[in-house]
Curated annotation (Swiss-Prot):
Pfam families: Ank, Ank_2. This is Putative ankyrin repeat domain-containing protein 20A5. It comes from Homo sapiens (Human). The keyword Protein transport does not apply. The gene is ANKRD20A5P. It comes from the Eukaryota. Keywords: ANK repeat, Repeat.
Length: 165
């Protein structure tokens, strides 16, 4: 379930005083701390994303306080149009956030298969590990997503990768 706490024009959040968003996997997002490009990614607003990128192309890989890019947030939220826009603009696909999660790991963790496929087709490395030693395949297995696991293996995921446990 996704909760949204977007601010209205009067400065109040839609859900009262809540200023946190959660994606399907509990990816916590403090909306008030995000830059415009990150807000567009969370909302899935491809038109706003285009405007942000037109203003400053350097924003493509801008990091929030958790070292997440717009691509991380778009993948966690399942916004295929925004993910496609960002990868076509040549953003960094294998960039790590504070938990060493790549956008691919985040897409798989949130069970956003369409986003994961886009990343894989654009060269995302499926063998990178997060701080716990988990790869995207580990998260696909944890969520019992055989379809995602199959796609990861097809794109070269190492079936022998070990986590830190």
């Amino acid at each position: 379930m996704k909760l949204f706490g977007f601010r209205s024009r009067r400065g109040q959040t839609v859900l009262g005083s809540i200023d946190h968003l959660y994606t399907g996997s509990g990816y916590r997002i403090r909306y008030s701390e995000l830059q415009k490009i990150h807000k567009a990614a969370v909302k899935g607003d491809a038109a706003e994303m285009e405007r942000c990128l037109a203003r400053r192309s350097g924003d493509l890989d801008a990091l929030d306080k958790q070292h997440r890019t717009a691509l991380h947030l778009a993948c966690a939220s399942g916004h295929v149009k925004v993910v496609t826009l960002l990868v076509n603009r040549k953003c960094q696909i294998d960039i790590y956030d504070k938990e060493n999660r790549t956008p691919l790991i985040q897409a798989v963790h949130c069970q956003e298969e369409a986003c994961a496929v886009i990343l894989l087709e654009h060269g995302a490395n499926p063998n990178l590990k997060d701080i716990y030693g988990n790869t995207a395949l580990h998260y696909a297995v944890y969520s019992e997503s055989t379809s995602l696991a199959e796609k990861l293996l097809f794109h070269g995921e190492n079936i022998e990768a070990l986590d830190k446990v």
